[in-house]
Amino acid sequence: MLDNKLGNRLRVDFSNISKQIEIPNLLQLQKKSFDYFLNLDNGESGIEKVFKSIFPIHDPQNRLSLEYVSSEIGKPKYTIRECMERGLTYSVNLKMKIRLTLHEKDEKTGEKVGVKDIKEQEIYIREIPLMTDRVSFIINGVERVVVNQLHRSPGVIFKEEESSTVANKLVYTAQIIPDRGSWLYFEYDAKDVLYVRINKRRKVPVTMLFRALGYKKQDIIKLFYPIQTIHVKKDKFLTEFNPNDFMDRIEYDIKDEKGKIVHQAGKRLTKKKAEQLIKDGLKWIEYPVEILLNRYLANPIIDKESGEVLFDSLTLLDESKLAKIKEQKSFDIANDLANGVDAAIINSFAQDGETLKLLKQSENIDDENDLAAIRIYKVMRPGEPVVKDAAKAFVNDLFFNPERYDLTKVGRMKMNHKLGLEVPEYVTVLTNEDIIKTAKYLIKVKNGKGHIDDRDHLGNRRIRSIGELLANELHLGLAKMQKAIRDKFTSLNADLDKVMPYDLINPKMITTTIIEFFTGGQLSQFMDQTNPLSEVTHKRRLSALGEGGLVKERAGFEVRDVHATHYGRICPVETPEGQNIGLINTLSTYAKVNELGFVEAPYRKVVNGKVTNEVVYLTATQEEGLFIAPASTKVDAKGNIVEEFVEARQDGETILARREEVQLIDLCSGMVVGVAASLIPFLEHDDANRALMGSNMQRQAVPLLTASAPIVGTGMEQIIARDAWEAVKAKRGGVVEKVDNKSIFILGEDDKGPFIDHYTMEKNLRTNQNTNYIQHPIVKKGDIVKAGQIIADGPSMDQGELAIGKNALIAFMPWNGYNYEDAIVVSERIIREDTFTSVHIYEKEIEARELKDGIEEITKDIPNVKEEDVAHLDESGIAKIGTHIKPGMILVGKVSPKGEVKPTPEERLLRAIFGEKAGHVVNKSLYATASLEGVVVDVKIFTKKGYEKDDRAIKSYDKEKMALEKEHHDRLLMMDREEMLRVCALLSKAPLNSDQKIGDKNYKKGQTADISELEKINRFTLTTLIKAYSKEIQKEYDDLKNHFQNEKKKLKAEHDEKLEILEKDDILPSGVIKLVKVYIATKRKLKVGDKMAGRHGNKGIVSTIVPEVDMPYLPNGKSVDIALNPLGVPSRMNIGQILESHLGLIGLRLGDQIQEIFDRKQKDFLKELRAKMLEICSIPRLASEKEFIKSLSDEELLNYARDWSKGVKFATPVFEGVNIEEFSKLFEMAKIDMDGKTELYDGRTGEKIAERVHVGCMYMLKLHHLVDEKVHARSTGPYSLVTQQPVGGKALFGGQRFGEMEVWALEAYGAAHTLREMLTIKSDDVEGRFSAYKALTKGENVPATGIPETFFVLTNELKSLALDVEIFDKDEDNE
């Protein structure tokens, strides 16, 4: 059993199998990938590779060359927090050392003869975004995540598809897919000709490509066909007897050279009979003439006397040709009837012959290889003039130039594996052999001998993580730069000596490419930060979309489906609903990604039917053909498989295998699903569709005011808390020395002696989803802490476990129709106790700009605003902290200069006498929007360099400075304490050299002083005392003192740097002189209309909040918290919720029993407690917690017991849940009826409800679809410019569209006047709107409506088409 007691809570674990390995760090894929990209210590980091692939760059005349020497990465300038506040990018600068070499050239030959000059220069590439320790990026102050991409692995793939032209015919294709470069498609057409396409251009016969690669006709025939030699003897055609030619049933009699039949047609030639015939001396057999008639010559036939070519190779034999050939002794034919070959290549030759004939005439070239290269050039670049050398170079560049073509290591490995090649892995371009072997294998596939690939098999799809994606972007940027440098080379004529690397390189190109990727790329996403789970799963997401991936509109059903190889690698449950279903996936819990990008799943080895403890990680390709048993296979105590036949998996099929055949067994049952799905208890009893909704909705749960962990968990909660950055974890073990709201100090000891670690906590920060981010300590002074233990909870965490909801007492029963259609009835107690209350923080910002008429000003002095409307603003015009904000209130006052109208001389005179009037400024203040209500919790003010800071900015600067000073002071005190502890530890080990009085005690020479006495004395006494020790001790003391002085200097430097950054002028966009951000915290209580959900996809809307006294109550008087509709369970088939509520109720009842022991507080209540807890822990199969409880001290036991008194916590891992026997034992222990139901009384009448009701405890979540953020109403507001109709959507303060179908509804009711209003004055009759408003304010009747703007839009559209449209009144005389 692994030590999982790093958490601060004990759970009764129901696992069947003890875990062999820890769940790997959930975020290691991204971390590893980025570290590899930026790792400059080893020469093989991703960034180095990219530079080396682009440099050196030479100019066309070989005069100059630019080489890459080395690169160095700087330190980030601002901290993560500052970047988020100031809207900056958390990044580093990259220093590239570039060498420019100027070559001496020989005037006559133009060859390089030596080096004339070498210059080296460092070039800065600014702003390469740096991954934060929480695996995200801060881009322009916003936290983003780069999602991993799941794309087709480079290599070769063979496919079989239905023909689009011929019905019921299969088409066979092969594709060679590089990571970068031209794709190569081989395909058969309807007439069995093998063609090749390059990059989806026009197809050419495959032999054309082979000729362009330099192969002659005979070579190609020999590569693809077995050559059969036919001997001519006495007018008969004889060939050697080869039994392999007669594998299938034989069409003709086999005769020996004398014409005797040795085997009859229509019978199979068995191996035995063939061997017998060879024994009997059969060497030559007759080759039937009728079969010879449709064969082709493999070599040309030459007349021996004249030397003239009678028949060229690939001549089709007919009777007249055979008559002439009989004069030869022997000739060769291409045996296209052999096994695994067909006539495709011969047909291709027939096709390309015509093309080459035409080209010969037009190009006046005889060499067929050159002609073939020209043909390919013409297909790839139609309409361009061509020279044969250029064409050959072009074909060579397409596939054999490392700059243009890259298969990568993965592609090379896949090619070698599939085609049985042995090309070294560093050859990442194609070879001739690759192309030939691919065509050969495709012919094999067509003839039923090869293996067709499955494009959705995880051996053919790989993961590109952040490091690789960034490397690709960097490569694109550098390639652009390379092109620009080559263009600059050509424009350089004179003064080559004066050129510096900086003149040639423009680093901006690289920066813009990278920033574009982070801001606009499809894979760089705004981080989902609703709760820690949503963050972790976002970073583990695998997307098939993005650059070089699929397009969601075109992705078919097969790509989206669950594949057998997903088992243990990709979660089959968690994927979005909607058009992205199946294209966006998540890694399974235990899955890892190897360095080639393939996903691996863990298994335990099985040897001769015995399960070993060796864990191996295998990719989908490695596990092909192996027999794998499920984790639920019965195994005895020694690890032997019990049953003789086991249900095992092989290549995705389930089969019965003997236990000796089984080679692997699943690590555990839960390895199939991902992180979110493994948080659902009793997942095995839920329908997959509902489990999908359950996993997705847990990611939307809002962090509540007080988090509480689920009574029924799965054991996964602490793993997520362990790997999410929200929690604070101890780096090293020790004892808690000091704790307050903002910091924790831990005192420990290592090889060097005592040390003190310092941890800070963040408070009330806003996340991307506007939820509140807050950390609070969960350890007390004096607690012992292990390394890696959670010492402070983040949001949605409770005692180091994920806690995204609340345990609520629920009853499945209808309640006066209020829980119709999944609605939820909630007790008022839940609202009163703030159970489901959450805090949300909104950020509002306003900027003051520099305009052509003057500068905008942030001020309290606003024209035409009442005094009481600005009472809550301070002198600087910004809302004070603590102000209660209501919709429509001013948050920040701002005035903007009006464009001046030239004043008349009189006005100028009056202004000169009475001073400036506020008449030439306009109110442009920031107002609270319609739905914003809350308290101002923070204000940030940024001022541009050269502009004066206002009072508020100065105050906030002073406040921040004070906080920094306090933190520095605390850390200095702790460092002093650490120094004293180390000194005391040193002195307490060594004997004294003379008699001394230390504290209250006298010591003789040779004695050692007590550490407790040493700790009492002050520093000055220490300096004199140290002289009473040996020279060695004095030296060690001096070393310690120096070490701490250096540490203090470092701390001071760090502090000064922080102060310097604080004092720095703020970086603001051009034109902006001041930026103010106001943060408003809103408390959102549970309301009617809020969406709630359980963990099993059981979601609903709160329909009513009922007084506690009216809710149904239990016999003991306790009323139910929530009433759910029982009809929501059977049709949805998520029975897991029923089992969860049973187990939850058991937890509560057992908690009550523990509380009773506490309440009785008898003499030996500790013994009683321990006995009770042991009894509960002995129910699971493994009973792994028993030993742990026995080993606890009384103090520790009390801690765990107090936690359990509120409800005993269970862990039922997925697929290993509580079984029936355990349930019945638990029911008995908790004194609950076996049907799990109870009597209930109606809260309104006090009568007993007729039926017994299922009451239990379920973990309920409040989701971030809050009614306060959805409800929206408008009277008047903005109108669209062209149509003059109200705009749409809440964000724009728009109206509700009254569409076509709504019009039908009013027509159906005959509501003509209402309908006319809807279509005119309430929509787009501009004049009508004004006149209606006037009439209403004056209390008159609304006048008749005018013409809607839409009509004018239509007539203007017609006018633009030169049609004169006029509008006539009906009353006018008809002219």
Curated annotation (Swiss-Prot):
Q: Which GO terms describe its biological process?
A: DNA-templated transcription
* GO MF annotation terms: DNA binding; DNA-directed RNA polymerase activity; ribonucleoside binding
Q: Which InterPro entries match?
A: DNA-dir_RNA_pol_bsu_ext_1_sf, DNA-dir_RNA_pol_bsu_external_1, DNA-dir_RNA_pol_su2, DNA-dir_RNAP_su2_dom, DNA-dir_RNAP_su2_hyb_sf, RNA_pol_bsu_bac, RNA_pol_bsu_CS, RNA_pol_bsu_protrusion
Please provide an example of a Pfam family that matches this protein in its UniProt record: RNA_pol_Rpb2_2
EC class, as a word, reads: transferase
- Role summary: DNA-dependent RNA polymerase catalyzes the transcription of DNA into RNA using the four ribonucleoside triphosphates as substrates.
Subunit-level organization: The RNAP catalytic core consists of 2 alpha, 1 beta, 1 beta' and 1 omega subunit. When a sigma factor is associated with the core the holoenzyme is formed, which can initiate transcription.
The name of this protein is: DNA-directed RNA polymerase subunit beta
Report the gene name. Answer: rpoB
